[in-house]
Amino acid sequence: MIVADLKSLEEIAASVAEYRKILVLGCGSCVTVCLSGGERETQQLTRELIRSGLFGGKLPVFESGTVIRQCEKDLVETYQQVPPDTEAILSLACGCGVQTVADTFEPLPVIPALNTTFYGASNEAGVWREVCQGCGDCVLSHTGSICPVARCAKSLFNGPCGGSQNGRCEIFTDNPCAWAMIYYRLKKQNKLHLLHEVHAPRDWQPAGGAGPRVRIRTGIGGSPQK
């Protein structure tokens, strides 16, 4: 099972402040079990955003809904309740769910409300492709909902390496270059300016660099105790 924690209300509000109509979309699977992103938490976060006072008098229109599993594209495709004129989706799913929803409703921006943290075991026969490593500090709002940690063979944060050719990965040539995917996704969204932003050096402690991690449920939607 994938475990995720709610981002701070301030970070969430800042990430969606430019949009006028937002769908807050929960997930009925892992994050429901860990009390971070189910129907109850989705409704609670929507209420908290509306009354937060963090939008400077320009409060967006918020609507909410829940998909059984955001990480399964066929289930996301059956979701027919995206309101007209929706400008962005605020996803309460893990990084896999955020990226699946973004692929399904492209080029609609999909913003993560959670930080995916770590994974539990699930014994199920099937095939999965890794798109999230649970780094604990989700950057998908800056990369077009495509994870450079998991989908770049070198986990680069500053663009493609010199070996990327024709949109393919230097290490695994059958795979697309993650940063080429990020570039074209942001281009479709008219958000190439995000590639010019300067970010602080990466802190890998939330990814487990400080030893085994413990999650304690407290506060709204299971946000971690500070």
Cite the ranges covered by each PLM segment.
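Iron-sulfur (Fe-S) cluster-binding modules
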Residues: 1-66, 77-89, 103-142, 146-226
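Membrane-embedded and interfacial regions of multi-pass energy-transducing membrane proteins
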Residues: 69-70
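N-terminal glycine-rich "phosphate-gripper" loop used for MgATP/nucleotide binding
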Residues: 91-95
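Short, well-ordered alpha-helical microsegments
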Residues: 97-100
